[in-house]
Structures are given as structure tokens and as C-alpha cells.
Amino acid sequence: MAEYSKLYITNNGQALMAKMIAGSGNIDFTKVCSSSTQYTESQLQALTALSNIKQTTLVSKVTRTNEVAIKIDAAYSNVDLKEGYYMRTLGLYAVDPDKGEILYAVCIEKSNNCYMPPYNGVTVSAAYLQLYTTVGNADNVSLAVSPGAYATVGDIQALEKEIADLKAFVGYSDGDIYGVEVDFENKKFTRLAGAVNRSAGSGFDGINAFGGRKRCNLTNDGRVAAYYGEAGFSTTGKLTQAVDRNPVGTESPDENLKFSAGTIVQVMVEQPKFYYKVVPLKTEKRTKGAITRKIRYYVSDTPKAGFKLHPAFIVNGQENDVAYLAAFEGSLWDASASAYILDDSQVADFAADMLCSIANAKPLSGLTQNATRGNIRKLAEKRGTGWEQGVVQTASASQMLMLIEYATFNMQSVIGNGAVSKTDDGKTSMTENTGATITLGNASGSVVNANGIQIVSYRGEENFWGNIWWWIDGINHYANATTGECETYVADHGFADDIKAAPYEDTGMTAKYGNGYISAFCYSEDFDWLFLPGEFNGNTALPVGDYCWNQNGTGWRVAVLGAGWNGGLGAGAFYWGLANASSARSRFVGGRLVYRKKVAA
């Protein structure tokens, strides 16, 4: 990276500044020249010209930064450059009313790493410069620049943002952007851009954010041992055969790609990263933030102007290419017995045991054991660095993809009601065992167990709704029964209950206190990815079709998602429970695993 000295005003530059202060005229900056000569800082003030000038560019922009200082923007390109050179010295030129064009100020490059290559007919290289200098009185500086000057990177970025904002409002037409417009008031959903004329399922299989989701076996240290459909793939929690992921014939095989039979693995869904944009066309203001009336959601596999990387792929500032979501509801690994608990025996040691994601297990619950959100967090984190229970960021990623793929919030109407139709017995955990959708593989859909209970899956995630609620981490919620508003705080690491201090951030919006069918979500620009219930005037079908519980007095609350075995038509991918204290445990609530690589807090 280039490292430049401060900008030294030459003797001629100081003389011009004195004339300006005396009222003899303005300063008109004209050009910036780059030289391959290596001067010393002690030489700069006396210079009247530069030797070995290799390139000259016009000044692109002059900006007053305060009463006595300005910023000069300029840019170089190598399009006309026949020979490469090191940019060792930069000179700023101005017009003196008596002497003509003078060398006003000079700086030198100190690292000797700033090389401008010649143009090879293929790759264009460029340098963007910002020079700051004093002028005595910034009001006496000409801000006009030559129309032949380069547009700077800053200008281009600003223009790109304006164009992106305009396109977002008018509507994207790009084939590799996929979106949906939701008109909450008129209960209408419209496919946008590349999603137009696509059908859910096969119509989205070729899009990496959707079709790139695939079940896999993940080791405790975050290595993929096998993918669904491969010979070594297992749903039992252990590899049943040795796996070597090195290409056949590799001369120097990577030992990290070799896995022995018996290796502990979890069944996860690999979710490729994607970028998103939310465009609020109509919102209704609240005390904090707003609620949605008409809004557009877009995703893309690749970065686009105005799009952001979805927070599911960001942990404490570190960006990840993938996230791993539990294929199945969490069960228990009993460390003392070195065995998976398959019947929800209430034997959890929250200091030693681990949360799991395997097939043919009855999901862990808080029937009698103290399976609070905080304790399920311990079970998840015990598996190793990067492991957590389900977090709001990854839950939101799946919610956003479902919404865009199906052009509805009501997943029960397009995938299936799920395991939500049982009559509760008032005393037991009535969950179905995990793994009923093994045969669906990476596809969405539903199967029916022998007892008539339907099990659903969204692209590898079984029972995202129904069967048992699951704790959602990374979101803390302070309910105010008096004002009817609930402040919400979110973090992507360093999880704890009942706090709003760092790393938690105020979302700038308040969830609706009370119970009912969701008719609008909350909105704030910084947390536009979050589907937080903001109004309860809906029904079992539209505009969302899912219920929300958020009424349990004033105080800190934690979140659950999805519904249990008796959730009925109120259940779904957007069915939130926001009424539990952090001390709560329930036979209706369990947990799910998530794996995201992360840096230390």
C-alpha cells in the first residue's frame, strides 16, 4: 500500500498564498503530476519543477474542508501508459497571476511500493488521489475544474449509489437479482426482476442462494465430511465409513480432507452467502422506526450496488462464505455415557453435554430439565468454536429466501401445515422424531408419518415450524406493557440474556406488545433484514398468516420461533413467541444448532 508524506507547500506556493491573503487574487489549482524521481522531504520546499514526470492529470474536484484548507481530488489511469514506473513524487500545480503556472505543493511516496503498470490491452489500472493543503483563506480558491478531468472514484461511487437507489425504487430488471414486492395493505405479492415467471422449487434450483443449500455432515471443528447423496453421508451422528475428499490420484493428499469411520458429525444445511436489499416503498412511523405497508425484498448471489451481505454471514466483523444450519431439531449428546440421547430423557448436564442435529431422535425439550435459552446456548457452544444455537440472523436468512421463492409469508399454504395438529395432553413432550424428511434430501416439501402427522422441510431444514418451538439467540427484547412497545436489541456474537450493552445494538424499532396475527413487520434501515412483528390485524392466511405471542407484562424477554405440535394455522416460518422470560423452560421448547466461523470477541 502506498504511503505518502505530508504535502509540502513550495516557496512559490507560499508566495502565491501571500498574494491571495493580500487580496491580489484567487488560487486556481490546475493539475497534478507524478514523477519517478525520489526526492527527500528536505528538498521539497525549494522545488520549482519536477524531473522525470511520467503522468499528468487534471484536477477533478476542489472541496473546501474548513476556512483555511481544501481537498484536491485527482485520478490517474494507465490506458495511455507505454512503460510502467514507480510513483515516487506527486506535485500539485496552481496559477500565479504574475508567474503563470507554478509548482504549489509536493509530497513523496515513502514505501516504494506504488507502481503504475503499463497498459497491456486488457487490465486497466488506476490511482485515486486526495491531497489536502492549506491556502490561508479557502474562500479565495477557485472551485471550478476542467471538464476534461477524470471523474474520481468518489464521484463514481456516489453516482452508482444514486442509480442503485433509483433502480430500487423503480424496480430492478436484472436477471440475476430476485425479488418480491409485498403490499401489506392490499395483501398482494408480486414477483420482481429475475424472479418473474419463476416457480418455487425447480425455478430457483439454479440460483446458488437457494439451490446451493445442501445437507452435509459437519465435524466439530467445522469441516464438511460428506454431502447428501455421497456414499459416506450419514444421519446417525457418526460416519459409518471412512471418507477421503481428496481427488482420486492426488500425490500429496490433504489430511484434513480425510475422515475415519466413527467420526462425530452433525447433519447440517450448508447455506451459501448472498446479498440483499430491502426497499421500503411505504412505511408508517412509530415512536422508534416504522412498520411496513409496502416493501420490496431482493437477493443476489453476487455483490450489487446498494446491496449488503446478509448478516447471517457476518460474525463480529468477519465475513464468511457459508453458514451451516441444523437439518433437524436439536437432541442431546450425553458426555457421561458418550452416547446420543434418542428419547428426550431429561438427563442434560448443561456444563458437559452437547446439542446435536441427527435423525431418528426425539427433540430435546424442557419437560423437567432446565432447558432455558441460556442453557441450550451452553450445550451448543460446548461443541466447539463457531457453534451456537439458532440465531436471529440465520433464521432471518431462511425466512427471506422462503419469502422470495414462494412470494408469500404463509409457508403453511405452499409447503405444508407441518406437525401442528395434535391435541396437547397437558403433560408430555409430544414431538415426532427427527429425520422423517431424509428422503427429500435438499428439496422442499413434506412427508406424512405413519401416524398421519405431517413433517415439513425447506431446502434441507426440517421442521423450521411445527413439532417444537426453538430458542432464537442474538435477540433480546424489553417489553413495556404500559406503552405497548417493546425495545429490541440484536448481537451477532457474545450472546447473553437480559442485556442491551455491547455487543448488542439497538435495532431502532419497537415490536408490538400483545398477541395476534401479524399484519406488518417493523422496519429500520440498519436492521431491514429482521422480520419483527409490528402490528396484529391479520388473519390465518394474509398478509402473513402467522401468529405472535408478545404479552407477559413488563420486563426482559427472549424469543422462540416456529410453533409446537399444537400450533395449528397460527404456526409458520414467521410465528414468533416473544413473551418468555430468560428463566423459562418448557416441554414445548427446544433448540437447533448453527455453525458459523468467527473471530474472538
What are these regions (language model features)?
Residues M1-P147:
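N-terminal assembly/attachment segments of tailed bacteriophage virion structural proteins
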Residues Q38-Y39, P97-K99, F274-K277, E329-L332, ...:
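Acidic glycine-/aspartate-rich tracts in secreted/extracellular proteins
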Residues L81, Y86-D155, F274, V278-P280, ...:
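Beta-strand-rich solenoidal segments
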Residues A151-F169:
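A signal for long, low-complexity, Ser/Thr/Asn-enriched, surface-exposed stalk/shaft
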Residues A168-E270, Y276-V278, W387:
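GGW-centered surface loops in extracellular recognition modules
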Residues K258, G262-V265, T302-F464:
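Short aromatic-cysteine micro-motif
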Residues Q393-S396, V420-N433, T439-L440, V448, ...:
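C-terminal, surface-exposed recognition/capping segments
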Residues Y478-D492:
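A short, polar/charged loop-to-alpha-helix boundary motif
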